[in-house]
UniProtKB/Swiss-Prot annotation:
Protein name: Digeranylgeranylglyceryl phosphate synthase
Keyword Cell membrane appears in the UniProt entry: yes
Enzyme class, spelled out: transferase
Main location: membrane
Function: Prenyltransferase that catalyzes the transfer of the geranylgeranyl moiety of geranylgeranyl diphosphate (GGPP) to the C2 hydroxyl of (S)-3-O-geranylgeranylglyceryl phosphate (GGGP). This reaction is the second ether-bond-formation step in the biosynthesis of archaeal membrane lipids.
Gene Ontology process terms (BP): glycerophospholipid biosynthetic process
GO MF annotations, alphabetized: geranylgeranylglycerol-phosphate geranylgeranyltransferase activity; magnesium ion binding
Membrane-spanning intervals of the chain: 12-34, 38-60, 84-104, 107-127, 146-166, 202-222, 224-244, 256-276
Length: 276
């Protein structure tokens, strides 16, 4: 067993980014910076939930990761599966304990999110489209958690909708990228059922829907600062163009990375709008 596997299996960079999105979500909701204690707790609750989710996902995804991600800790033997299971539960427990320090509502929201993460990894992930919706919903509620922690939704509500929509697109594109390994496992993902081309059209629909939804605050009278979202929308549209043009593994990988980047850039665009 490798000690570094306890960090590696959580995907710490992703967890830190998720925590940051939660923190920025609270700032988007308030239109200002909340007190330091809330910021720290939101960051930790979201990061620990993400860490637990990634770990339990690797536990249930062991067989497919032997094909698609052989370098990860479990398939390469750096950590045994039983240890990964208990480690994920420990991370969830610590996150819930910290959520209680925010509020009962924040605790309940975190509990629901953590249960969804477990169910996604255990049962929902192989289900065509339902698994995509589940993980996209978890991404969408990340900035919303920060808003709940400060007791105000504000622009964070629209941000959550956009994050959900673009992540549905990204999850479908990721399935297009992983078709080879999923076929060997016998998974029934959307690209396997519909074909890569039709799945790309579905992903494109959600990508374009994100762009449309991103302009809802403009109709509500949000100031010119909100137009910081325009470059993000262009990135999303370019990712859509790529996956419609070609559905090979390399192109799908590039497209999903662009969609992933757009999620984080959108948070900053909404933050600019909220602060201005």
């Amino acid at each position: 067993m490798e000690l570094r596997a306890f960090v590696e299996i959580t995907r710490p960079h992703n967890c830190a980014l998720a925590g940051l999105v939660g923190v920025l979500g609270s700032m988007v909701a308030l239109g200002s910076v909340p007190e330091g204690k809330i910021l720290i707790l939101v960051f930790l609750v979201v990061s620990l939930g993400c860490a637990g989710g990634n770990t339990i996902n690797d536990y249930f995804d062991y067989e497919i990761d032997r094909i698609n991600r052989p370098e990860r800790p479990l398939p390469r033997g750096a950590m045994d599966r039983r240890t990964a299971l208990w480690y994920s539960l420990f991370l969830f427990a610590v996150g819930l304990a910290l959520a209680l320090l925010i509020s009962l509502k924040a605790f309940a929201f975190a509990l629901l999110a953590y249960i969804t993460m477990f169910l996604y990894a255990w049962k929902l992930k192989p289900l065509p489209f339902i698994g995509n919706i589940a993980v996209a919903a978890l991404t969408g509620v990340t900035p919303l958690y920060g808003a709940i922690a400060v007791g105000k939704i504000g622009l964070a509500g629209t941000l959550a909708v956009c994050a959900f929509l673009v992540n549905v697109a990204r999850e479908i594109v990721k399935d297009i990228e992983d078709v080879e390994g999923d076929l060997k496992k016998g998974a029934k993902t959307l690209p396997i059922i519909l074909g890569r081309r039709k799945a790309a059209y579905v992903a494109a629909f959600f990508g374009v829907a994100t762009v449309i939804a991103s302009f809802l605050p403009v109709k509500a009278g949000v100031g010119v600062g909100y137009y910081a979202m325009v470059p993000v929308d262009l990135i999303i549209l370019y990712a859509v163009y790529l996956i419609l043009r070609n559905q090979d593994e390399k192109t799908a990988h590039r497209s999903q990375l662009l969609l992933k980047a757009s999620i984080f850039l959108a948070v900053f665009a909404f933050l600019i709008a909220a602060l201005m």
